[in-house]
């Protein structure tokens, strides 16, 4: 299962770019309506479950994106199930910048090597394992999401 829990560890060791951006917005008072983090969205047999912090901070966006996936015909890629929480770049956007941001990240609950998939952080984590159908499902889902706004 992806890393869970309320302790995000040392904030000086992860998501440095999003920490900096959330703390130093490019315009004073800048406020985006929402954010969508795409993390490792091209893997073979990827499925994108509801991520805990996404539902905690931006439930309406989770609902909108997963609904858009169903409308676009990609509900098999976006199951209506919880997949645990992950300490990722969307946390500083939510917690520091106060912009509702979701994380679309694969979760492989049956994978023995890693819940992020069998090639994650291995020498096999390369372009040979990118699936054009998964990328299409995510891309078309995002187009449908924007259409529904």
Name each region found by the language model.
Residues 34, 41-149:
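Active-site-adjacent substrate-binding region
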Residues 1-60:
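Acidic/histidine-rich catalytic neighborhood of metal-dependent amide-processing enzymes
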């Amino acid at each position: 299962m992806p890393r869970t829990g309320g302790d995000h560890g040392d904030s000086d060791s992860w998501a440095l770019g999003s920490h900096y951006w959330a703390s130093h917005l490019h315009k004073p008072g800048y406020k985006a309506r929402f954010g969508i983090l795409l993390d490792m969205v091209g893997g073979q047999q990827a499925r994108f479950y509801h991520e805990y912090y996404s539902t905690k901070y931006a439930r309406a966006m989770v609902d909108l994106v997963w609904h858009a996936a169903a409308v676009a015909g990609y509900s098999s890629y976006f199951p209506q199930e919880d997949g645990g929480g992950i300490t990722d770049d969307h946390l500083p956007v939510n917690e520091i910048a106060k912009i509702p941001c979701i994380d679309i990240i694969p979760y492989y609950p049956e994978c023995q090597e890693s819940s992020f998939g069998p090639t994650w952080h291995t020498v096999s984590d390369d372009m040979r394992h990118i699936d054009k159908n998964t990328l299409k499902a995510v891309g078309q889902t995002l187009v449908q999401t924007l259409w529904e706004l």
